[in-house]
């Protein structure tokens, strides 16, 4: 149950921060947080990561519903000792739902976190994207370092 609370917290934080950006910033406006490193930039994305597959809403709806269902099934099958995987899945669930809500209600995803790594301008992203990324990393860490292989029928 705690993993669903993590997902809910991600969705609330994601939607609140997006609302703030839409409400108080002009599209394209950028506010420096740390010069040459981190900015809040009002941006919209009608595709997937980095603008891929722009305008393919039904594909995104279908994929998201399948992913959310798979995450919920996986969470239900977790053992109590698999907390790291559960946290990762909770983050992934919240991130998937956060961006799904944007696609359904706005027909675009609000992005606003703009980071620079040296001279490289990283694509603008949001809280949901961050949660998805961290969730995937945690799931991989769990799988590679903590998961025990299932014993087959011998």
Swiss-Prot record:
Any GO CC annotation of this UniProt entry: plasma membrane
Topology relative to the membrane: Multi-pass membrane protein
Active site, UniProt feature: 111, 129
Keywords: Aspartyl protease, Cell membrane, Hydrolase, Membrane, Protease, Transmembrane, Transmembrane helix
One term of GO molecular function: aspartic-type endopeptidase activity
Enzyme Commission code: 3.4.23.36
Reaction(s) catalysed by this chain's protein: Release of signal peptides from bacterial membrane prolipoproteins. Hydrolyzes -Xaa-Yaa-Zaa-|-(S,diacylglyceryl)Cys-, in which Xaa is hydrophobic (preferably Leu), and Yaa (Ala or Ser) and Zaa (Gly or Ala) have small, neutral side chains
Principal location: membrane
Superkingdom of source: Bacteria
Pathway(s) per entry: Protein modification; lipoprotein biosynthesis (signal peptide cleavage)
InterPro entries, per database record: Peptidase_A8 (IPR001872)
Location of this chain's protein in the cell: Cell membrane
Matches recorded under Pfam families: Peptidase_A8
Biological process terms in GO annotation: proteolysis
Transmembrane spans: 55-75, 85-105, 127-147
Family under the similarity heading: Belongs to the peptidase A8 family.
Listed NCBIfam families: lspA (TIGR00077)
Physiological role: This protein specifically catalyzes the removal of signal peptides from prolipoproteins.
Protein name as annotated: Lipoprotein signal peptidase
Gene source species: Geobacillus kaustophilus (strain HTA426)
Gene field: lspA
């Amino acid at each position: 149950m705690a993993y669903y609370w993590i997902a809910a917290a991600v969705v609330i934080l994601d939607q609140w921060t997006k609302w703030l950006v839409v409400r108080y910033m002009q599209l394209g406006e950028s506010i420096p947080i740390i010069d040459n490193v981190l900015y809040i930039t009002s941006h919209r994305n009608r595709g997937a990561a980095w603008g891929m597959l722009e305008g393919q809403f039904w594909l995104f709806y279908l994929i998201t519903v399948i992913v959310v269902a798979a995450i919920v099934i996986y969470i239900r099958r977790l053992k109590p000792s698999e907390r790291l995987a559960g946290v990762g899945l909770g983050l992934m669930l919240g991130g998937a739902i956060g961006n799904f809500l944007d696609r359904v209600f706005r027909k675009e995803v609000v992005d606003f976190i703009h980071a620079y790594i040296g001279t490289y301008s990283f694509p603008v992203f949001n809280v949901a994207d961050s949660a998805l990324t961290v969730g995937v990393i945690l799931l991989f860490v769990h799988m590679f370092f903590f998961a025990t292989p299932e014993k087959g029928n011998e």
